[in-house]
């Protein structure tokens, strides 16, 4: 079946929906590995789920360092900018146990996410391997993917622990990911919001 550059083929990921004008679906014909970020990518940012994580980060810093909200937000922002993630800054500057932090910040209400059978069906239509690459923990990803009903669509979850707590976009993290799963970057695509 042929398709125009502005609409995907009917059996494509999104089905017969119009997308950005000029999108050439044939550019993805070589892809055999589909990699998805989790937060605000596999679920809609409009769910405000990650806002819960952000608030929990701030609360963790407030409690750990006896700071008010504004000071905690400043520290959170500064560590993110300087180290690529708040967690990395807390580890490097304060010797923080990352597991305590991850357990705390990911203690959120995932019931705000609806099941996503259409997304599951779309992922099923992608030929090849499907992997999740997240800056969160595997437990966090599992809870979200299970809630959405799409956990079984993915071969593996590569989390911040597997990345040795080095956040994206550090090049060595992508190299580690590709090495661990035998991914050829030339035939892979990463979706990240």
PLM-predicted stretches and their roles:
Residues 131, 137-189:
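Substrate-recognition "cap/lid" segment bordering the active-site pocket of phosphatases
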Residues 93-95, 126-130, 184:
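Short glycine/proline-enriched coil/turn segments at helix->beta-strand junctions
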Residues 1-9:
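N-terminal acidic, proline/glycine-rich, low-complexity intrinsically disordered segments
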Residues 10, 17, 22, 27-120, ...:
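N-terminal helical cap/lid subdomain that shapes the substrate entry/recognition surface
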Residues 28-31, 127, 185-187:
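A general structural motif
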Residues 42, 126, 150-153:
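Short, structured coil segments at secondary-structure junctions
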Residues 191-193:
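Acidic di-acidic motifs
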Residues 125-127, 136-137:
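Glycine-rich active-site/cofactor-binding loop and its immediate structural neighborhood
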């Amino acid at each position: 079946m042929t398709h125009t550059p502005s609409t995907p083929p009917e059996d494509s990921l999104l089905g017969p929906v119009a997308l950005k004008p000029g999108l050439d679906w044939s550019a993805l014909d070589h892809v055999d590995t589909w990699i998805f970020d989790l937060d605000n990518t596999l679920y809609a940012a409009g769910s405000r789920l990650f806002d819960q994580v952000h608030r929990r980060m701030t609360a963790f810093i407030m409690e750990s360092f006896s700071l008010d909200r504004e000071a905690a937000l400043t520290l959170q922002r500064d560590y993110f900018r300087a180290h690529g993630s708040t967690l990395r800054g807390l580890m490097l500057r304060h010797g923080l146990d990352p597991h305590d932090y991850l357990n705390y910040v990911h203690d959120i209400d995932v019931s705000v996410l609806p099941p996503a059978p259409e997304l599951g069906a779309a992922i099923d239509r992608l030929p090849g391997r499907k992997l999740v690459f997240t800056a969160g923990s595997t437990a966090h990803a599992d809870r979200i993917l299970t809630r959405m009903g799409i956990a079984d669509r993915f071969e593996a979850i590569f989390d911040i622990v597997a990345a040795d707590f080095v956040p994206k976009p550090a090049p060595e993290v992508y190299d580690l990911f590709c090495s661990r799963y035998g991914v050829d970057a030339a035939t892979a695509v990463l979706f990240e919001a």
